[in-house]
């Protein structure tokens, strides 16, 4: 049985908003509302949803880059929530991150070798020669030359810069890599190359991915399991192939309808999603998706649905999950 690399339990993150008056009530953006999931060793887990759904906030909290209001994040059984910088330092080698922007995430004043080696500061027992050897090894693994270590980021294309970022994430030989929209800033022609590289590296090193994306086609290609987020909550979770073939939440269904897939052979009327996600700033009764949902009924406005089992390792938070695939019929 595969061991659990990442376990997130009831994670909560609320951002306070500026008060409208001195004695006014404190308002919040409810970015994460009790998010829970696990990722097994050697697998890829996708987090999908529109901008503003909480994906990147989740990534920052998993990486302990900001304070968490409540909940637990365990990496290889080690709790990271509430840890000080000094306490996190020896744990950092086990989890690394690849950021969205290959231009902004690399210091232009540092050589590639220095950038890639930076995470090794968490590994105390490496000498200079071993660090240099590790840099050469990992640059070769991502399709770059060891001699590229002497160059600067501006000498590389966007796709090459993202390879440098991936090399930096791999340098400590982590168990987990959190990839936040790692190909969205790249040309379409380069995206496939980077995705193939990520798959090859997983086969070679056995690394586990938490992969964040708004592009469901990318998640389908790379991820074994996935969770769909809406306004800070997971509304559906399961094996990627199961969710694609049998979505159990109307939000998931609508997101999937937006993905061209001529090879699927399935014919169904496409449902369009009206409006956009602006962030949840107040608690409200009922389902958070009710204003945009084509299936909304009185029960949805009165009672918030909870995650329930809809199949093997497949859960969804919808009162009418068994009717989702009937959307647009007739």
What are these regions (language model features)?
Residues 171-175:
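A short, proline-enriched helix->beta-strand linker immediately N-terminal to the Walker B motif
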Residues 3-4, 17-23, 239-330:
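Short catalytic/signature loops enriched in Gly
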Residues 22-26, 80-96, 122, 129, ...:
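ABC ATPase NBD coupling module
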Residues 152-156, 160:
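Conserved ABC ATPase signature
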Residues 178, 182, 186, 190-268:
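P-loop NTP-binding/switch modules centered on Walker-like glycine-rich loops
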Residues 71-82:
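Conserved ABC transporter NBD signature motif
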Residues 79, 129-147, 256-257:
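Conserved ABC ATPase "signature" region
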């Amino acid at each position: 049985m595969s061991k659990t690399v990442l376990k997130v339990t009831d994670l909560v993150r609320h951002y306070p908003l500026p008060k409208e008056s001195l004695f006014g009530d404190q308002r919040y953006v409810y970015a994460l509302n009790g998010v829970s999931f696990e990722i097994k060793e050697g697998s890829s887990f996708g987090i999908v949803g529109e901008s503003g759904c909480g994906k990147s906030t989740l990534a920052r909290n998993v990486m302990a880059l900001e304070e968490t209001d409540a909940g637990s994040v365990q990496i290889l059984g080690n709790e990271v929530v509430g840890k000080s910088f000094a306490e996190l330092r020896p744990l950092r080698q086990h989890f690394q991150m690849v950021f969205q922007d290959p231009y902004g995430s690399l210091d232009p004043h540092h050589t590639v070798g220095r950038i890639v080696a930076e995470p090794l500061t968490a590994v105390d027992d490496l000498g200079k020669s071993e660090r240099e050897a590790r840099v050469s090894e990992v640059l070769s693994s991502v399709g770059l030359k060891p001699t590229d270590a002497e160059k600067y980021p501006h000498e590389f294309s966007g796709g090459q810069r993202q390879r440098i970022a991936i090399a930096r994430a791999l340098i400590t030989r982590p168990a987990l890599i959190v990839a936040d929209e790692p190909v969205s800033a790249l040309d379409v022609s380069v995206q496939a190359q980077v995705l193939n590289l990520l798959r090859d590296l997983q086969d070679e090193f056995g690394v586990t991915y938490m992969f964040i994306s708004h592009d469901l086609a990318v998640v389908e290609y790379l991820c074994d399991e996935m969770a769909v987020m809406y306004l800070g909550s997971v509304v559906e979770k399961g094996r990627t192939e199961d969710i694609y073939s049998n979505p159990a939440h109307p939000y998931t269904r609508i997101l999937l309808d937006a993905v061209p897939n001529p090879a699927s052979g399935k014919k169904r009327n496409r449902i369009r999603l009206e409006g956009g996600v602006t962030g949840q700033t107040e608690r409200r009764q009922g389902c958070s998706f009710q204003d945009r949902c084509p299936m909304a009924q009185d029960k949805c406005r009165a009672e918030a649905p909870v995650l329930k089992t809809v199949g093997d390792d497949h859960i969804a938070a919808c009162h009418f999950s068994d009717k989702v695939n009937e959307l647009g019929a007739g």
